[in-house]
Amino acid sequence: GATTSRLHTAVKIAPAYHAPVVHVKDASRSVPVLNQLLSPNTRRKFLDELETGYRQLRESYSTSRKNNLYISLAEARANKLKTDWDHVQIIPPARPGIHVFRDFPLEEIEPFISWMFFFIVWQIRGKFPELLDDPVHGKEARKLYADALTLLDRIKMEKLLRANAVVGLYPANSVGDDIEVYRDESRSEILAVFRNLRNQEQKKPGVPNLCLADFIAPRSSLQIDYIGAFAVTAGIGADQLAEEFRQKNDDYSAIMVKTLADRLAEAFTELIHAKVRRELWGYASNENLSLDDLLMERYIGIRPAHGYPACPDHSEKQTLFTLLEAEKNARITLTENFSMVPAASVSGLIFAHPFSQYFFVDKIGRDQVEDYALRKNVNPETIEKWLASNLNYR
């Protein structure tokens, strides 16, 4: 899943278990792996290649750890992204506040589906639609595509999956590495505070140590800035439909349901983000991009998701969900470990800063762990548990 990685499996998990441990990016990829493990003809070769790959990852990781140099949190903050906020055009949202989309038509979401990523889930790589004519994988790809479209048509006709979303657009300012979200432009009432982490790698001259707070005007600048938050799902009904197929011993269709729900959720997120840029916020009202342009992220701004490299702490989803009232407005909930239910859901923040970019927080030092724990009002051990794969001292 998204919270795991092949590197973490190779370095931390596999050495601690007596039997083979295989990392897959999501559940739908388990079937091809299991087929190779269960077949006497492929099992040994698969496991040998797996262990070779893991060994290479461990060696590469060990070398990089020795070569990587880290700086103190104070030094990293001194090397933050420098923005002349007096010369940045900050555009207030055209329609601030909460926007709720319930039972959004799947027909409008479908054009935003990335079929290339659909095929990657089934371990078929290539550019779509050229992939359908590939001499090696074309036949299999065409069957998968036809099956997916047939099921998607049934889902749309019988309304078997439902898509909901909630978006919030608010005044905001950064205070240090945190982002304060306000009820209105008086900034007298704080609705939420997002705690962020800063990259601590030693950089080349002129390269900043980034933090998401760098993309929001500091309160000390006297500028009122803005931030967006969103939670999107296209998975309401997916578990029930998949279970119906499983009861009929049709695991293929059960996996297809989950795969389509995931693709629809990502497509819905793309649609909602475009709607925010062009209409609700309107900071890119003249934007006219193709689907390929959207998937290549050729738009202004970013939408980082908690649990991913720029903001690896999943627990910050709780702040996001409380701010958006995501359970009431979109029927999305969080588990005790901050996974989203339905699984085919996406959430995160929206930044409009013209130079905002995705980046890796990567490894952080004990000084940042202690600072972050203080800001979140938890003990450092809790942070070490949540961010175990992000520590540079273990």
Regions found by a protein language model. Give the residues of each.
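Structural recognition of alpha->loop->beta junctions
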Residues: 13-28
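C-terminal accessory domains/tails appended to large, multi-domain proteins
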Residues: 209-215, 220-394
